[in-house]
């Protein structure tokens, strides 16, 4: 990767990351105000939304070939990277353990991982539908 492309990638990721982080703050604040602090609804919501959108964008942008490269930097690496948060997920698990709510750790992780996988696949299926490509998630039975 040459220097110009590297700097362009960095700027696109930073721009998308700024918007994604801001969006995470807004969603988290709204859900905290609505549902309170008993469960990390904001982190769960942004991680599931991010999973769905990432699945969709991965398929949709892949169909654009090299033309989708800059959009991938901006939207997937930047926006979705800024929106979703693994560190908050882990920190909230630690808070559950320290507040004698250890059972919530398992529930929270299971919900996040299982629904995250479901949402990324649903997003990919929607991307395949929009791109009219039914081969996206098919299993190659010849291998």
Swiss-Prot record:
Cellular localisation: Cell inner membrane
Membrane topology classification: Multi-pass membrane protein
Binding site for Na(+): 81, 84
CC terms in the record's Gene Ontology section: plasma membrane
Entry keywords, A to Z: Cell inner membrane, Cell membrane, Ion channel, Ion transport, Membrane, Metal-binding, Sodium, Transmembrane, Transmembrane helix, Transport
Gene Ontology terms describing biological process: cellular detoxification of fluoride
TM segment ranges: 3-23, 41-61, 76-96, 103-123
Stated regulation of activity: Na(+) is not transported, but it plays an essential structural role and its presence is essential for fluoride channel function.
Plastid is among the record's keywords: no
Matches recorded under Pfam families: CRCB
Reaction(s) catalysed by this chain's protein: fluoride(in) = fluoride(out)
Single annotated GO MF: fluoride channel activity
Family that this chain belongs to: Belongs to the fluoride channel Fluc/FEX (TC 1.A.43) family.
NCBIfam families: PRK14218.1
Record's function text: Fluoride-specific ion channel. Important for reducing fluoride concentration in the cell, thus reducing its toxicity.
UniProt-recorded name of the protein: Fluoride-specific ion channel FluC
Species the sequence originates in: Xylella fastidiosa (strain 9a5c)
Phylogenetic lineage: Bacteria, Pseudomonadati, Pseudomonadota, Gammaproteobacteria, Lysobacterales
